[in-house]
Amino acid sequence: MSSAPTPDAHAYPLLIKQLLLMPLAVSPEQEIVYGDRVRFDYRTLQARIGQLAGLLTSLGVGHGDTVAVMDWDSNRYLEAYFAVPMIGAVLMMVNVRLAPEQIAYTLNHSGARVILANREFLPLLDAIDEQLPDLRTRILLDDAGGPLPPRFATEYEAGLRGATPVVRFPDFDENARATVFYTTGTTGLPKGVYFSHRQLVLHSLAAMAALGGAPRQGRLHRDDVYMPITPMFHVHAWGLPYVATAMGIRQVYPGRYLPAKLLALIAREKVTFSHCVPTILHMLLEHPDAAQTDLEGWKVIIGGAALPRALAQRALARGIDIFGGYGMSETCPLLTIAQIDVDSVTDADEVLSLRTKAGIPVPLVDLRIVDPDMGDVAHDGIATGEVVARAPWLTQGYLHDPEASATLWAGGYLHTGDIGNIDEAGYLRVTDRIKDVIKTGGEWISSLALEDIIALHPAVSEVAVIGIADTKWGERPLPLVVRKPGSHVAEAEIIELVAARSRSGDISRYAIPERVSFVDAIERTSVGKINKKKLRGLHDPVLGTGGR
């Protein structure tokens, strides 16, 4: 019998354009909202994607060219998420919170020739203009109105109105590069992470299956109202704009993140599903407007850093359906989600414990905890090792950096650089970054576990724990504590809080700090993560200035 393929059978490529098919069929009248400025339906979204594609094509953008975007979260960014890769070009998302020299580096390193830039960022672009010799075409994204600056080809809306729209987008290799962005690591230059059409489609489908398949808790469905509170320049806003679009969900984009504005949008647009780093949620709950904002039933995935128990307790008390997720820039990012069966898990402590874990792997993810020899450790919730993973959407390497790529994929698994354990039920808990584990007296102390304990004190607003050099023990933990406004807590109280948990067996006695530093603020990276490298430089007398 012949096994030759049928001559007319179509080898269907997994391309980003396919994500638009279902919403246009089932919910074409659903809305896309941008702050208080823009409101239109999915039919208009499709038309605008075609217009943007036509504009870019008319400006000479072709297959494989890189188009950069510098904008806050907006409908324009969503349109670029689709239009740029759908013509075969590569979408480069500029992290606008990097230093100007780093932004110039990432634009040059990515090979960007075209940029869509918000008027707010023109002073920054002007400052690095001489460092961008290959940036040939500029399109203005303008909320405020005003004249077109020199060297700009057109304003975005005017360009769309004058463009001949692309109606039928071509098929091409599903492994073609679709996006590139840059990690915000605390060492060295930013690294370029890239993803193909196939990877982004499979990531979207797996996220839909994981979030949409939940029985009740944390479930994402077509009646939700989605608003990202993770920047669209950061890991595709965790890929959720692609998911929300594919599902035909009402979407709200807030522009620049201002707490009062975010809370007002949640109330006005009845937002039901978001995601953010712990810092952002903490900031929102601390804002005076939060007390008058109904947050009951708001589903929030926390990622980018571990979900502190104290923050989870506070969110649950407000009726927020809060739960953890886990991944990294290199994993697109989704690896695990901490959803629970609320009907079978009723004990409050167990519910809190599960919600604050990293969760269980989403479909298609092969997740392991390994020792230094790549051997598996026991899934008992105790044995720890490095988290390594395989999935069809993990980056295949760092752009133009084969040495770092080889290290990332040593042994055929992607190395996350995180330490964790998996319990009998399959839930992952990340206990620390390898580089942040405090090695003291032969023991490994989790800085995250210490932070969780200290954060429970009612007078503590924020806490970060770092390891500082010690001649006797190698390293010792130093908690850096931000007090709540109007509150007071003494050093001895923090030390005794940890000591009490040590006496009850919750943490090693080696974790009890000798001193505590009270600070006004905690240094963070451009995407809101605690910058422990910088904190060590500031507070370790061996590495930096020391001080209290």
Can you say where each PLM-predicted feature lies in the sequence?
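Conserved AMP-binding/adenylate-forming core of the ANL superfamily
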Residues: D8, Q30-S74, L78-F82, A99-A104, ...
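Gly/Ser/Thr-rich phosphate-binding loop
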Residues: A246, R268-C276, L285-S353, D366, ...
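Conserved beta-loop-beta connector loops within the AMP-binding
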Residues: L364-V388, E424-A425, S487-E491, N531
